[in-house]
Amino acid sequence: MKNDKKIYGCIEGGGTKFMLALIDSDRKMLAVERVPTTTPEETLGKSVEFFKKALPQYADSFASFGIASFGPLCLDRKSPKWGYITNTPKPFWPNTDVVTPFKEAFGCPVEIDTDVNGAALAENFWGASKGTHTSVYVTVGTGFGGGVLIDGKPIHGLAHPEMGHGIPIRHPDDRDFEGCCPYHGGCYEGLASGTAIRKRWGKALNEMEPAEFEKAREIIAFYLAHFNVTLQAFISPERIVFGGGVMHVDGMLASVRRQTAEIANSYFEGADFEKIIVLPGLGDQAGMMGAFALALAAENK
């Protein structure tokens, strides 16, 4: 089937599921599939099979793959492990080559980056941080991660930012909880992620009674506010976009903005945290559109 628009394979690789899609150059989804994240062999195998079945009718128009994946990832193109998930705590997935199965099966360009860097790109192209030079995308859900864009390009250094593993100041009413990160205990991920919330209180925020909920929300917002002030001090972002389920509970965004402003104490010239700290403009599609942005990058390399 000849298509006037280019077609891209897009993979949003998460810790619980891989979302797969064929998307055309107008950002229209032509085919979508969900594959549980089990073992690499099973998950990547089923992902390849989906595209093998979905692609033939678009074969003349297909351009490239973009993979926005959980990490950590090796993003050094000079390394033989470029495109590998490295020392993840997720069982079965350490030292997994994510790129090669798609390259070998389809023989086309493939670009990979972290899920949060992908979402940061998507929000910068089409969403809440469009028009900014410096922006951050943060997800606070099962885990905690962030991606930074400077002049529209993700920061890569030794690897990529691991924002969830910075160590925050402890809330005075939260000193007894050791945190849940297997590497650092009380890092941002270990204290403020959805996993940490459930381990600390035995339930999600939206399952709590009002009094318990308000106290828990203020504690989590305290950590996110300190995180924001650190970001503002280090890289001066014009926009901090917060995704993930934790941010969608009642009053969380308002509490994070308020506590950020209180901690910043009017120090940062021109910093209006009501405008800087926002939810994704692309909503729940930021991750998949991140994979699409990476597919566009793969085509143009």
From Swiss-Prot:
Domain of life assignment: Bacteria
- Answer whether the UniProt record assigns the keyword Kinase to this protein: yes
Annotated positions binding Zn(2+): H165, C181, H184, C187
Q: Name one GO molecular function term.
A: fructokinase activity
Keyword entries, A-Z: ATP-binding, Carbohydrate metabolism, Kinase, Magnesium, Metal-binding, Nucleotide-binding, Transferase, Zinc
Q: What class of enzyme is it?
A: transferase
Q: Does the keyword Mitochondrion apply?
A: no
Which co-factors does it depend on? Mg(2+)
Task: Give the reactions, separated by semicolons, that this protein catalyses.
Answer: D-fructose + ATP = D-fructose 6-phosphate + ADP + H(+)
Q: InterPro entries this protein is in?
A: ATPase_NBD, Carb_Metab_Reg_Kinase/Isom, ROK, ROK_cs
Q: Gene3D superfamilies annotated for this entry?
A: 3.30.420.40
What EC number(s) does its UniProt record assign? 2.7.1.4
List the CDD domains.
ASKHA_NBD_ROK_BsFRK-like
Q: How is its activity regulated?
A: Inhibition by zinc ions.
Family per record: Belongs to the ROK (NagC/XylR) family.
Please report the name of this protein according to its UniProt entry. Fructokinase
**Organism listed in the record:** Zymomonas mobilis subsp. mobilis (strain ATCC 31821 / ZM4 / CP4)
